[in-house]
Amino acid sequence: MTACTFLAGGLRDPGLCGPTRWAPSPPGLPPIPPRPRLRLRPPLLLLLLLPRSVLSAVFTVGVLGPWACDPIFARARPDLAARLAASRLNHAAALEGGPRFEVALLPEPCRTPGSLGAVSSALTRVSGLVGPVNPAACRPAELLAQEAGVALVPWGCPGTRAAGTTAPVVTPAADALYALLRAFRWAHVALVTAPQDLWVEAGHALSTALRARGLPVALVTSMEPSDLSGAREALRRVQDGPRVRAVIMVMHSVLLGGEEQRCLLEAAEELGLADGSLVFLPFDTLHYALSPGPDALAVLANSSQLRKAHDAVLTLTRHCPLGGSVRDSLRRAQEHRELPLDLNLQQVSPLFGTIYDSVFLLAGGVARARVAAGGGWVSGAAVARHIRDARVPGFCGALGGAEEPSFVLLDTDATGDQLFATYVLDPTQGFFHSAGTPVHFPKGGRGPGPDPSCWFDPDTICNGGVEPSVVFIGFLLVVGMGLAGAFLAHYCRHRLLHIQMVSGPNKIILTLDDITFLHPHGGNSRKVAQGSRTSLAARSISDVRSIHSQLPDYTNIGLYEGDWVWLKKFPGDRHIAIRPATKMAFSKIRELRHENVALYLGLFLAGGAGGPAAPGEGVLAVVSEHCARGSLQDLLAQRDIKLDWMFKSSLLLDLIKGIRYLHHRGVAHGRLKSRNCVVDGRFVLKVTDHGHGRLLEAQRVLPEPPSAEDQLWTAPELLRDPVLERRGTLAGDVFSLGIIMQEVVCRSAPYAMLELTPEEVVKRVQSPPPLCRPSVSIDQAPMECIQLMKQCWAEQPELRPSMDRTFELFKSINKGRKMNIIDSMLRMLEQYSSNLEDLIRERTEELELEKQKTDRLLTQMLPPSVAEALKMGTPVEPEYFEEVTLYFSDIVGFTTISAMSEPIEVVDLLNDLYTLFDAIIGSHDVYKVETIGDAYMVASGLPQRNGHRHAAEIANMALDILSAVGTFRMRHMPEVPVRIRIGLHSGPCVAGVVGLTMPRYCLFGDTVNTASAMESTGLPYRIHVNRSTVQILSALNEGFLTEVRGRTELKGKGAEETYWLVGRRGFNKPIPKPPDLQPGASNHGISLHEIPPDRRQKLEKARPGQFSGK
């Protein structure tokens, strides 16, 4: 089909417009052969009937794309494609009187903001626009085109439908991909985009389109950076996310030179994702036609890894009907001199045909719209409407009209580098038909498993493939079983908790059977009093813990398990049972254990459900430990007890420690006052009544309204908020502590110096100004204590110190010492006794420590067996060892290094190096014999024999040392390498202790001389091994690797065959590379270029004319 036939309405006349009948091409294109004859068809007469002004009209088509910023898009040669289309169109227009078409190549920036600007600029210059390519600019371009009356063909928009002035070239990419995914039932997909704006926007537009069709797009991620590392990171995000069947690659195809897709596929092969568990679908191939055929793809032929990874790729691309291809059409156009003869067709992207088709499709819509409008100028909307009905000759086949273009699914066979057609998409039904070749998945597998078909059914809500009614019933069953299980667990838990609370060692519910009262025959008021400890001031008790002592005459004291207890009654007298919330709250409070916090023992319940009926109704009380000295208020009121500052500070420090412990456990006392602080028989103060408000709230008992006298310790912010007063705050406890400190320091009631009634004091504290606070003179306490009190009285809660800060400040007053009157004398005696015991223990420990140091030092100088013999005073006889392995090493160029270094630097060098060696030999069965200068000597097989293992131990140690030396650097000359040479030899020797002063364990024999000779004839970074050692290593068969060095002249031995030890199988540590010795160079020194300039001057002064030497 040719342009002339579709301009008149789409009738086909192959004899009229053949490929040889085009008009001369525009400048830049080769000349076109002249048309020999003209034959008019009746539909063409429509153009001839148009007014002459219309026939001579010029229609400018803009081709917008990232031609300048994207080299792969530029390979589509949009200039040649658009000019070829215009040339053919103008040839038809010249023959049949149609309008003339001109094309303008417009660059589109690769960045999204620039793309929008390019669209806006292009719409003012053209009558029709092919583009944009960036999906982010598609919707704005359509709106601007409607306003400007310009027709659009946005072939790069993945989800665009024909609407307004927009007419797509092909079926939207989302529809084609959806059809493919539905055919294979792959619902869960992920999108990986290139980092450029164009592809990122395309990925988001495609994901939106797929989600609109009901598919669960699991992930949309970008490759950043756009290399192999970015590809690995993107694929790891795919692995870590929800299950995925297919990965859509929104980027240039690797078949066109896309490096991002190459990296992604190679990374997938490395990570094992190209094994058939995932399928990879390229996105950009939906916009052009890749043709199957026998031609090899060079990009696959040149890389076996990519060819293997590409086996997991299914390529969906436009289908050229009748077996044609873009490459064949390019070849025919070049043969007819419509394209330059020197154009390399292999370098032209198949996108050439898409650009050509877009221009032709737009021209067809213009022609049909003008005919329908009687020859007048038409709007973009009219052109778009007629494009849908136009049928034009595409570059490789018919295009447009009622028939949608089709797609073909291409695949490789994993071994070759060719593409085969497997399925063809039916454009009308949306189904694939087999093209004869089955899809080949990696490793011959079946590919990713299918998802439930409900994902592709618009009338079904998909829940993992299960029917909604079944899901709903299952959900109800699970919820019902969960509720039943929760109820059963709750019931069992509370039942078990109740059993534990009423019986056993941890019970907390106490009855009349558990507590013995002082006057069991009295009335109810004699059983449990109101719980105020104020009345204790009238008592005189010498020892309430003794049954034979004088007992107080009050019924709020009882005997529980042999100890006296105190009962604090709950308000009211109608408590039938203890609520579960009360039990839980009390269990948490009872867990508070501290020396300065009174211990709660249980909840007493008389009458009701608590046990045998008591006179009256049920009585509920908190049972706590009883303190013999009563409350702090009682103690302060007893004037016969003298309280000096030592005594007062001891009490206050106990109080601070107790409140601090409660605050650390998140407990605000809320009712802190001097009568809630009790003192035991040892004058240790303890905080009690804590958590009482929480227990009342759990038991749903309203507290009794506090009197003004009880509110003297309450912070001002709590006085203003009754609800907050019942609960208490941490800052409120600090304020109450400050009032108690005033009581203790002044030994008077709160605010006693103000001569005001409690009601007046509470009113002034609640409603300042002025501030109402106690007054303490500086002669009653240290100034630091008074300042701390004033900080605790601060009006603003946030200005008061925390209990940790209060504790630190108060400790600093007495320098951290705790004083107690009664314990003072006992403490002195105990301290003297304990000091004496500690002194003896310390001296004994020091003696033992020094002995261990001496033994450790001796064993470092001599073998343990020899050291023990010397300590016992027994003589150490020389011992003959049949077979040992010796190690010798020294530093190459040590004399040169010494000449370039200060003496202290030489010492530091040897100390650092030998410390490194000593750390290594600790991991091997070897014995360090000695070090002389830069020489290091180690032996294995003595003084403890180890069979033939000595050779392997020395060899392993030598490899470890050589590896460590490769990274060792001198502190004063880090740029100068430290090279060592190592010699190993196995054989017999004699070992013994020589001398009485500074005895040394020495080795004697020919083996020692030979090992030393092996070292001296070695090379830097080499392990020189004698034949005897190699034979033992071979017999051990532990994988040691040796190389033959050749015959070496050994001092006193003559020429012998020697070897290099180069490694061991499984030894993965790096070994430094031995330096290459130039002919005539010494193997014992340092090269001139390795010596720093500043050190070289010093060396010249020390050794003129010589720069290396041993």
From Swiss-Prot:
Residues 493-813 form the Protein kinase domain. Coiled coil: none annotated. The keyword Protease does not apply. The chain crosses the membrane at residues 468-492. Its EC number is 4.6.1.2. One of its GO terms (biological process) is intracellular signal transduction. It is a single-pass type I membrane protein. Activated by GUCA1A when free calcium ions concentration is low, and inhibited by GUCA1A when free calcium ions concentration is high. Negatively regulated by RD3; inhibits the basal and GUCA1A-stimulated guanylate cyclase activity. This is Retinal guanylyl cyclase 1. It comes from Bos taurus.
